[in-house]
Design a protein with these regions (language model features):
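Flexible, glycine/charged-enriched surface loops at secondary-structure junctions
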Residues: 1-5, 43-49, 73-75, 93-96, ...
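Accessory "access/gating" subregions that flank catalytic or transport cores
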Residues: 1-88, 95-98, 102, 212
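Buried hydrophobic packing segments
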Residues: 33-36, 57-66, 83-86, 111-122, ...
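Aromatic- and histidine-enriched alpha-helix N-cap/loop-to-helix transition segments
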Residues: 52, 56, 106-109, 162
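Active-site-proximal binding-pocket segments
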Residues: 72-79, 88-135, 145
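Functionally critical mobile loop/hinge segments
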Residues: 111, 118-218, 222-223, 228
Length: 230
């Protein structure tokens, strides 16, 4: 309805042609997330891990670990269990619904789950797993839900790509820092989501699954200016 074009295949092909290995990794991981999320935008079958709007994050990391990094399937299963635990804690103590808690509740939790999956699949110590999950969740706090025209397409599809990259970044930091010096615990960040949820609740009708939030508002203004100039 908003004439959105698929970009996953183009992003993947161009990323594979990049001469820098690091950029190829980011580009291909983003493409995996875009591909899965675009399926959700089309109304096709997806895995809600934890939601439809965030359905591109976990599949992107699983695909990257299995098909690119050749991680053993049993390690993936163990990682999925860790991801499920993270998702359960976030749901039990706050929410997974963007309509209730903003996009931090969907992309944020999906990224946190994916970070825990990566760390577990690579046999990281439990503290590193926790730190990775915490970092991924922390850096989505306050993210609003404001889909353009009410469809789970813009900015939702690209946010899945960013959520996947953030998950890998969170694991990279957690696995290389001194784990015991990580200042914020996962539990503290989950509780911080309750504070953010309260702020979003106060502004309900603008930043939580509406067509009156930041992205939709700026889009409408741009269309209005274009109409006036013509």
């Amino acid at each position: 309805p908003i004439k959105l074009h698929s970009k996953a295949a183009t992003v993947y092909k161009r990323a594979m042609d990049d001469k820098f290995q690091g950029d190829r990794g980011i580009g291909t991981l983003s493409a995996f997330a875009l591909a899965a999320s675009e399926e959700n935008g089309r109304g096709h079958l997806v895995i809600t891990a934890p939601t439809g709007g965030s359905a591109g994050v976990m599949p992107a990391l699983v695909y990257a670990l299995v098909e690119v990094r050749k991680v053993d399937n049993q390690k993936i299963r163990e990682g999925m269990l860790a991801a499920a635990a993270v998702g359960y804690l976030c749901k039990h103590h706050a929410t997974l619904s963007a309509a209730e808690g903003g996009c931090q509740a969907e992309i944020g939790v999906a990224s946190s789950m994916a970070a825990a999956l990566i760390a577990t699949a690579y046999d990281a110590p439990s503290l590193v797993v926790e730190n990775a999950a915490e970092s991924a969740l922390e850096h989505h706090l306050g993210m609003t839900c404001d889909p353009v025209a009410g469809y789970v397409q813009v900015p939702c599809i690209e946010r899945c790509a960013f959520g996947a990259v953030k998950a890998w970044t969170a694991y990279g930091i957690a696995s290389n820092e001194i784990a015991a010096r990580h200042r914020i615990s996962f539990d503290e960040t989950v509780l911080a989501r309750l504070v953010s949820l309260g702020l979003i609740e106060q502004s309900r009708g603008r930043y939580s699954a509406t067509q009156r939030g930041t992205m939709e508002l700026t889009r409408r203004k741009a269309l209005l200016r274009s109409h006036r100039s013509s």
